[in-house]
C-alpha cells in the first residue's frame, strides 16, 4: 500500500510541468520565432483558443460513485459462493433446509467403460438375486405412483449462498455444550 501511494505521488510530481507565467501574446511570438518556416502549423495553432495551463478545472466526483465502481470491479459475492457451495433441498412441508446427498455415486469414465463390458456378458443369476430384482421392480412401480414437486427433483441444481458471519454463529452454537434435565 505504501509503495502504491509512493508511486502515485511520484507520478504526480513528475507530471506537473514547470511553466512560468506568460501572456498569450508572448507565447505566440516565441512560437513564430522558433519556426518561421512552418507558417501553416503556427496559423492553425493560433486559431484555436489558448488556455492557460496553470488554470485547471477541478470537478468533484461523489465518493458514492467511486465506491460503487470499486465494488462492481471486485464482485465479492462470487468469492462467498465459491466458499460455501453445497446442494440443499427445501422441504415444502416444514420449510427446513437439509443437505442433499446423492444416492448413487457418479462413476468415472473408465469405470463406465468397464461396466458396459461386463453387462454385455451373459451371467446366470441365483434365485436370491432374481427375487431381489423382482422386489426392486415392485418397489419401483410402487414409488412411481407418487408425484414429487419439481423443485425436489432438481435438488442438485440449487445452490445456497451463505453469509460467512452466520456460518460462524452456527458453528459456535453447535460447539457450546448444553445441559439436559435428568
From Swiss-Prot:
Q: What keywords does the record list, in alphabetical order?
A: Milk protein, Phosphoprotein, Secreted, Signal
Extract the Pfam families matched here: Casein (PF00363)
Q: Which GO terms describe its cellular component?
A: extracellular space
According to UniProt, the tissues expressing it are described as:
Mammary gland specific. Secreted in milk.
The residues forming the signal peptide are: 1-15
Q: This protein's superkingdom?
A: Eukaryota
Q: Where are the transmembrane segments?
A: none
What subcellular locations does the record give?
Secreted
Sites of the modification Phosphoserine?
22-24
The record, for PROSITE patterns, names: CASEIN_ALPHA_BETA
Q: Quote the InterPro entries the UniProt record gives.
A: Alpha-s2_casein, Casein, Casein_CS
* Gene Ontology molecular function: protein homodimerization activity; zymogen binding
Q: What is its main location?
A: secreted
Q: Which family does it belong to?
A: Belongs to the alpha-casein family.
Function comment: Important role in the capacity of milk to transport calcium phosphate.
Name used for this protein in its record: Alpha-S2-casein
UniProt organism field: Oryctolagus cuniculus (Rabbit)
Amino acid at each position: 500500500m505504501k509503495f502504491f501511494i509512493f508511486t502515485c505521488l511520484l507520478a504526480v510530481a513528475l507530471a506537473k510541468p514547470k511553466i512560468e507565467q506568460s501572456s498569450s501574446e508572448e507565447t505566440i511570438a516565441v512560437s513564430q520565432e522558433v519556426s518561421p518556416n512552418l507558417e501553416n502549423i503556427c496559423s492553425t495553432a493560433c486559431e484555436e483558443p489558448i488556455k492557460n495551463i496553470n488554470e485547471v478545472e477541478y470537478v468533484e466526483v461523489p465518493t458514492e460513485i467511486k465506491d460503487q465502481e470499486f465494488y462492481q470491479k471486485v464482485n465479492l459475492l462470487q468469492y462467498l459462493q465459491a466458499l460455501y457451495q453445497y446442494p440443499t433441498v427445501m422441504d415444502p412441508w416444514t420449510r427446513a433446509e437439509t443437505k442433499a446427498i446423492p444416492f448413487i455415486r457418479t462413476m468415472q469414465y473408465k469405470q463406465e467403460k468397464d461396466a458396459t463390458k461386463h453387462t454385455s456378458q451373459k451371467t446366470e443369476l441365483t434365485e436370491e438375486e432374481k427375487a431381489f430384482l423382482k422386489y426392486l421392480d415392485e418397489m419401483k412401480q410402487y414409488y412411481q405412483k407418487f408425484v414429487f414437486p419439481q423443485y425436489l427433483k432438481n435438488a442438485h441444481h440449487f445452490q445456497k449462498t451463505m453469509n460467512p458471519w452466520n456460518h460462524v454463529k452456527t458453528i459456535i452454537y453447535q460447539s457450546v455444550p448444553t445441559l439436559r434435565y435428568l
